[in-house]
């Protein structure tokens, strides 16, 4: 049985992704912060996890190593958006966002790297807000979130380069505007998310199980610009 680690698996895209992998016969190690993972399945192992806390990251990574001798996939889904309406860069919020969306991802991933073998897949959930090739930004909001996702994109490329010789595939994936708690933060009466978590989960599963090209940024099943 193949094993996947999914962070932030108690709601939204993470929950839908956990359900998708379980339905396909995978064992899922899912992490949650506060709310439990409301799935009844013998192949789900739920672990409480705080991605902003180095001690929690160290503890959870060791627990995962006790559970699994190898990993077939890691879905770095957990993240925060706390400056959606801010049009200035608040240093406190930027620092907090980087701790969760970048440092936490790097810390957990690096600790788990020994468990990955040829054809295993690491997926970093990203966003169009992390794209730096746009000639002009849409607006000045969410600076911390944008910065964090741009940094995560570079980590994705850097990691892909480092582990390519081991046959490990590393990808970034932007799920689009999804109907989740985070996605609805910026929704209005006239503009709302146009995708459901299950659609994003299908994209993630297809990426993990079919794509062999490493170091790419994916959106809606196609490669996109960094």
Where are the regions that the model predicts?
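N-terminal Rossmann NAD(P)H-binding glycine-rich loop of SDR-like oxidoreductase domains
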Residues: 10, 14-19
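Conserved glycine-rich Rossmann-like NAD(P)H-binding loop of the short-chain dehydrogenase/reductase
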Residues: 24-38
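Rossmann-fold cofactor-recognition segment
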Residues: 42-55
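Active-site Tyr-X3-Lys motif and surrounding loop/helix of classical short-chain dehydrogenase/reductase
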Residues: 59-63, 85, 92-99
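Conserved NAD(P)H cofactor-binding loop of Rossmann-fold oxidoreductase domains
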Residues: 77-83
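Catalytic loop of short-chain dehydrogenase/reductase
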Residues: 87-91, 95, 118-165
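C-terminal helical subdomain
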Residues: 165, 172, 187-226
């Amino acid at each position: 049985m193949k094993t996947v680690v999914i962070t932030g698996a108690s709601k939204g895209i993470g929950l839908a992704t956990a359900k998708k992998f379980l339905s396909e016969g995978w064992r899922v190690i899912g992490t949650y912060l506060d709310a439990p993972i409301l799935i009844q399945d013998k192949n789900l192992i739920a672990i409480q996890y705080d991605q902003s806390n180095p001690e929690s990251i160290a503890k959870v990574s060791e627990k995962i190593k006790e559970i699994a001798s190898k990993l077939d996939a890691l879905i770095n889904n957990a993240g925060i958006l706390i400056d959606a309406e801010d049009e200035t860069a608040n240093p406190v919020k930027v620092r907090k966002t980087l701790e969760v969306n970048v440092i936490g991802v790097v810390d957990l991933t690096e600790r788990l790297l020994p468990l990955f073998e040829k054809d295993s897949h690491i997926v970093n959930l990203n966003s169009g807000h992390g794209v730096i090739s746009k000639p002009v930004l849409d607006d000045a909001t969410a600076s911390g979130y944008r910065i964090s996702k741009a940094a995560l994109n570079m980590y994705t490329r850097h990691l892909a380069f480092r582990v390519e010789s081991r046959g490990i595939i590393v990808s970034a994936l932007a799920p689009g505007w999804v109907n989740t708690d985070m996605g609805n933060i910026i929704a209005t009466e006239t503009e709302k998310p146009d995708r459901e978590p299950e659609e994003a989960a299908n994209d993630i599963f297809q990426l993990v199980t079919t794509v062999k090209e490493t170091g790419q940024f994916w959106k809606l099943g196609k490669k996109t610009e960094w």
